[in-house]
Structures are given as C-alpha cells and as structure tokens.
Amino acid sequence: MANVSFTFDSQEQNKELRPSRLVGRSDERNGRRQGTEQKKKEKEDSGFRVSEEGEIPLQQGSNTDSYARDDLTQQQRVSDVVMQRRSHETESRLWQRARTQDRRGSESRMMFDGRTQWSHAPVLSSAYPVRPGEDNCLFYMKNHLCEWGSECCYNHPPLQEIPCRIGKKLDCKAGACKRGSNCPFNHPKERDGDSLPMPQGRTPDLRRNDSGRRYNTESRSWPENKEKEVGQFRDHQDSKEDAQEVLLQQRPRDVEMRKRSRSPDFRAKTETKEHREAEERSSRESATATGKVSGKENELRPTYVYLLMMPENHNVDVQQTLQEQRKRNIKKARIEARLKLDQIRPTVVLENSRATKMMIEWGFTDFRKLQGSNLGNKKWICWVRKHCC
C-alpha cells in the first residue's frame, strides 16, 4: 500500500511541475529573443551616427553594402518568425503528449482475464455518442476509433456489443442494402440460391492446404454434370436446322401453288369441287330427314355422280337439269315413305256380334239403340272407347 501511495503522489507532483517547467523554458526563450532584437537595432543605428551639433556624417560603406544589410535583416526577421512558430508548435505537442499520458495512466485499471489472470489493459473513453436510430460509424466499427469524436452524427455502440470486429467484415442485417458495391459488410442472403456466381471452367478447383500440397475440392464445374445441358443444347440446334431445311424446301412449292391459284383453270376446278361438296352435304341431310333412301335413287346415284364428273358440267343448262332431277327424286322418296308409315299404323276392326257379346257381359244396355242407326266404324269405335275404356 505504501508503494502505491508513493506512485500516485509522484504522479500528482509531476502533473504540477510539468506546466511550470514549460513556462520557465518559454520565458528564457523570449528573453533571448528580446536581447537579439536589441543587438540588431544597435547594429542598424551604428551605420548612421548623429553628432552633438546635429550633423549627419557620411554613410559608412557603399550602397551595395547597405542593400546587402537590408536583405540580411529581412532574412533574419523571417527566420525568427519561423523559429517562433516552430517553438510554439513543439510546445503544444509536448503539452498534448503529457496530457494524454496522464489520462491513460489515470484511466488504466486492472481487468480480469481467464487466460492471463490479471492484465493491465487500457479502457477507451466513452466520448463517442450512442445514437441507436442512426447508421453505425464504419470507421468506429472497424478500428474502435472515430476522428469526429462527440461531433460525429452516426451511431457508436458500446464495445461490449461489438466484440472481435477489428479488421473484419460484418454481415449486413438491414435486408436490402442501399449502398450497393460500396457497402463494406457481407450480404449472405442475397448470395443464396440462384444469385450465386457460377464457377467458370470445367477443371476441378485445386487449393493448397497448410502443408503446401494441393487437393481437389467439390465444385459445380465438373464435365459430368454439364453433359446433359450440352446434349439438350445440341438437340435444340439440330431441331432448328431441320426446321430451316423444311422451310427452304417448302418455299418453291408455295410459289408454284400461288402461280396455279392465279390461273383460270385452277379457279374453275376449285369452284367445281366446292359445288360438289355442297351438293353432297345437302343430299346427306335430305336422306337423314326422309329416312331410308329408295332403291330408285340408289340406281340413279351412279349416273348422277358420273354426270358431275363429266367436263360438260361447266355449262349452266346441265346444272339446272341436274337440280330438277334431284328435286323430283326427293319428292318421290318422301311419298313412298309416307305410304309405308300409313301401312304400319295399328288399326282395330271389331265385328258386331263379338262387340255385342262383350257389351252385355260388361253390363252395358245403351249400345242397342246405336245398333239400328247407321253409324260408321269410326263413331262406333269412339263410343266404345268412351264407355268401355
């Protein structure tokens, strides 16, 4: 304890004595400068001596000597000013060093460390402002120091929150970074997935370990993984080449078809084809509407088709006759179909004797009045339906 008290007393005495020593040195220097200035003035006045009678004697030396003296005096004055400034700067630097050493000595304390039980480590001052809403000071985050000090506008978190960050890049946790490539932090989220840069080349990566030997590492640029992609690309190229060849072969055909379509013969043929297709469609529709086609129409159909295939059908008269014949055939087919339907209808014919027996068995007696009347079969059937059914 006695040793510790002695050290603190000695430090306080040094603090009190240092400013006084510096002040004494500055006074001595100022006294020397004043003495040198007085000597210079006396030398300058010695060139011009005034007698008691008021007469000015001749100037000693020539004009060249006077000019040289003036230059020397100016140079001496400039050198004195420079030396004075340098002395002030050195004094201020020495004063600042003394103050910083005293501060470090006062702020230093014993910090416990598990590896080195007690270590004498300096603790930095908390002069930097903490602004949680602002961005972190980049220089402070890297070096734990800031040039602006308390005037800095950025955030300076305490040292406990940023351990082991000196000289290392941190992960940018702000999401989408606004600084872009100028940001000194890492961006692991943006590099995940497809945004990772693909390795170039197909050779395996060779890296050196601590012993100096090279070893293979797992890389995505092996040729085995890219054979499929290359094959797909080649197939795509082959399909494109085939399509181009087909187009080149098809172009002359298209040109020939266009030339033929402009000719009158080709137009007439196309018109006849369209006319045939329309007639065939109409005949099919009529056949489905009328039911079964008669045998006569089947007999006439080959002749009808033969007439259509003839080149003389281009005339209007032949076409009109064919249309009339077609209409007649349709009418005949309809008449025959109706007759067949009438024959297929069920007709009920009852004999009078049988009807009377049935009516007596059922208990009807009013029908005897109708027996004498001349009723037709239709009326008799209607009366039976009303009373019996």
Swiss-Prot record:
The keyword Zinc-finger applies. A zinc finger (C3H1-type) spans 131-157, 158-190. Keywords: DNA-binding, Metal-binding, Repeat, Zinc, Zinc-finger. Residues 1-11 have a biased composition (Polar residues). It comes from the Eukaryota. Transmembrane segments: none annotated. Residues 1-110, 183-296 are annotated as: Disordered. Residues 12-52, 86-110, 204-243, 251-284 have a biased composition (Basic and acidic residues). One of its GO terms (molecular function) is zinc ion binding. This is Putative zinc finger CCCH domain-containing protein 10.
